């Protein structure tokens, strides 16, 4: 694991965008694994800026999103399909036919999503956030390390955390379709971002903890190419570290 500790959220986003842009420059037809939630938004803004300044092009990029709420209309403003359009896809030159999100067509056979990824020769760079309980994707505590794309039940803590995006907690879906932990581990490179004091415990377990299903993120310790970029608040439970 490579750990990069920076001063603030903006620096984290800039560094992440730099790594993603280098991946695309080195391999224009890169297969990217993309994430949603509040963490990657500033990274996507920076990538849009790079595209507008003609530093990079996404025209040959293929993307696979980690997850999507189950039984949510794709045009619902809280769907991850809508999120990706509004936060990235509408502002870059990516071919929308090359943008995949695990949707209703995969409910009956979720691992068909993994087969689609395999057909694209695998994910070159997987972008991840991390939940306060250590979930990655929607792989909650006690998820199998061998799991492929599947329909999952969301924990109360995740439903509560995601309720900030909805008018009420009752509107938050209780299930999602998510790439499994093995699906994520199959990526050639992984880039995980975290900011804020509320992510500090999960980051501590990710980096210092034992590999355990109680903290799904700890499986990443077994991957041979993981870069973790965090701000000093997310690093607050790690001792003897200084911001770069």
Curated annotation (Swiss-Prot):
Alphabetized UniProt keyword annotations: Carbohydrate metabolism, Hydrolase
Keyword Hydrolase: yes
Keyword Hydrolase tagged: yes
Biological pathway: Amino-sugar metabolism; N-acetylneuraminate degradation; D-fructose 6-phosphate from N-acetylneuraminate: step 5/5
GO molecular function, one term: glucosamine-6-phosphate deaminase activity
Pfam family, one: Glucosamine_iso
Superkingdom assignment: Bacteria
PANTHER family linked to this entry: GLUCOSAMINE-6-PHOSPHATE DEAMINASE-LIKE PROTEIN BT_0258-RELATED, GLUCOSAMINE-6-PHOSPHATE ISOMERASE
Family: Belongs to the glucosamine/galactosamine-6-phosphate isomerase family. NagB subfamily.
Protein name: Glucosamine-6-phosphate deaminase
Organism (species): Mycoplasma mycoides subsp. mycoides SC (strain CCUG 32753 / NCTC 10114 / PG1)
């Amino acid at each position: 694991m490579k750990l990069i500790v920076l001063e603030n959220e903006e620096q984290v986003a800039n560094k992440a965008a730099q790594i993603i842009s280098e991946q695309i420059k080195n391999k224009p037809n890169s297969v990217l694994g993309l994430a949603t939630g509040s963490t990657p938004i500033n990274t996507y803004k920076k990538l849009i800026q790079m595209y507008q300044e003609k530093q990079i092009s996404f025209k040959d990029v293929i993307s696979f999103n980690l997850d999507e709420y189950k039984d949510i209309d794709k045009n619902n403003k809280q769907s991850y399909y809508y999120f990706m359009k509004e936060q990235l896809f509408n502002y870059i030159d990516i071919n929308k036919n090359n943008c995949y999100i695990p949707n209703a067509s995969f409910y009956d056979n979720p691992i068909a999503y993994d087969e689609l990824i395999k057909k694209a020769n695998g994910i070159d760079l997987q972008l991840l956030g991390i939940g306060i309980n250590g979930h990655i994707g929607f792989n909650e505590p006690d998820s199998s390390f061998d799991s492929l794309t599947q329909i999952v039940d969301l924990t109360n803590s995740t439903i509560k955390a995601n309720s900030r995006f909805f008018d009420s907690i009752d509107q938050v879906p209780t299930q999602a379709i998510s790439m499994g932990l093995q699906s994520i581990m199959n990526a050639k490179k992984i880039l995980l971002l975290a900011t804020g004091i509320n992510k500090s415990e999960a980051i501590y377990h990710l980096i210092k903890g034992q590999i355990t299903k109680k903290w799904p993120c700890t499986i990443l310790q077994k991957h041979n190419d993981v870069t973790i970029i965090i701000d000093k608040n997310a690093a607050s439970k790690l001792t003897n570290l200084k911001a770069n």
